[in-house]
């Protein structure tokens, strides 16, 4: 006899990215341009702090929200970027994923709605649905991956509780411009909804003039939750460390969810986290910038249209002219060219693929060469595909 489980979780699909990587693993020598994980080791000065912490026996329960000294350091770090949150308004989390989970667990009631501009990290939808709420998708492709205010307003209903924005964006690498941020602010203020800012890529920006939502609109701090991560800027994906910041009344409720989800982040990583805040990620950024230029040049030579990424380490070229779904394109690329990419349907946007350039230079060049050869063999678009693209949506992970 099979006993019933959570019906909300039953509707969720496994990560599409992980599935693509599993398929790639079945093909020896496959070059994976799929997973968003830096190829650099964590800087030694950060790792050394863990060794020191273990040597002195720092293996006991820490405060739920993180040690006061670390939260002070996080507050100061955010202050340097123009975001004003006190140490008491900061929680150290078990990665940005847990920060998102705790935020939505604290925020959502059954039947609430969360606006998710697409393309977007599939985890947002999964967490929203797991909390018995509804994801409402805002297609940003017609606006070159910016926020059209009229389209955003059309998504708002009496049930709307929040909007999630990610800038720089995963999977496009695009940055929301001032007009987009202002549109979100106006709608959020007028509708009385939260703005959840997934800012995990904010240190990986290639252009001047980048602004974060909380920096540009401090007047909405009571409605804003900021989420950051140690994973991307300092190559600490396996550490599972992140943090979130929000106004005191909001953080008090999120702290309850955080406590019951994970109790706390890892005690012997906290000094390392504080040390990371002092490490300049610019050397890694310079490498990513050079790789980005090579990728854009290669995509141009292949005749693939792409909105130039201004941050993160992804591109999101269009493959519409080939008349294939993004899923079919990526499966064929693995089987026929031994190169792995992520289908756009993982992010809620068909007709595109995500290409990650946080891999070694050797693998990147070989992967681009294989992709170029594969593209040259694809038939040009001849007629619309009869397949239901919406039905092929898959959640993404990392």
Label each residue range with its predicted role:
Residues 5-95, 102, 276-279, 283:
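N-terminal small-domain helix-loop-helix segment of the aminotransferase-like
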Residues 140-214:
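Active-site phosphate-binding strand-loop segment of PLP-dependent enzymes
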Residues 288-289, 302-336, 353, 361:
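Conserved PLP-binding catalytic core of the aspartate aminotransferase-like
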Residues 88, 106-165, 178:
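PLP-dependent aminotransferase-like
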Residues 381-386:
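Conserved small/polar residues in nucleotide/adenosyl-binding loops
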Residues 246-247, 316-323, 337-368, 372-374:
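Conserved PLP-binding active-site segment of the aspartate aminotransferase-like
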Residues 27, 131, 190-191, 302, ...:
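Helix C-cap/helix->beta junction micro-motif
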Residues 43, 223-311:
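PLP-dependent aminotransferase class I/II
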